[in-house]
Amino acid sequence: MKVLLTGGAGYIGSHTAVELMNAGCDVVIADDLSNSCREVVKRIEELGKKTVRFYEIDVCSEDALEQVFSENDIDAVIHFAGKKAVGESVAKPLIYYKNNLDATMNLLEVMQRHDVNKLIFSSSATVYGVPKVVPIDEKQPTWCTNPYGWTKYMSEQIMRDVCAANPKLSIVLLRYFNPIGAHESGRIGEDPKGIPNNLMPYISQVAIGRREKLSVFGNDYDTHDGTGVRDYIH
């Protein structure tokens, strides 16, 4: 099976690529490297012990996507590509709506032209907003609280509508929270460009010496467990 990974050089995409290769799949990656680098692709090939066909493209370009599908006999797609910083989405909502929704619609259109009918979409638990009940299950109501979450929810709805119109199409929507960790080899992991959007990259960067220290802000909640009470409860 030949699988296209959009955003496949990113944190989750790179680990997915390695696992697919280990399972015997051929992998094609389309990534604009806005939050990764070419070295990651080399490491994917090293860990997967196979060659990856890599396209440095913006998935928002329908012509570029058309080239990928024309040059490869794609069996299935996993769609990771998209902007993903909640805070940035609040400051720059139009950029997020245009980028993430254009990418989704372009991908679906090109898939239909090439009769590719299997898609896994990397959605997000942000579609649940602030849940009234935890733990969350799939039956919880959705109500997003930021533009990033809305782009994920809108992409899901577009996919539902396309599925309703095309019975051959099979789409899985994955709503997950932020993962942490790295490949056991240490060769790939979360290494964002610019300022990290969550805690774990800061910890990793301190561990490897890229940052001098991990800053903890505030000193007026001296609790035994620290994070759990100080940062969440208070």
Write out the residue ranges for each language-model feature.
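N-terminal Rossmann-like NAD(P)+-binding domain of SDR-like oxidoreductases, especially those catalyzing
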Residues: 1-182
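NAD(P)-dependent short-chain dehydrogenase/reductase
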Residues: 160-233
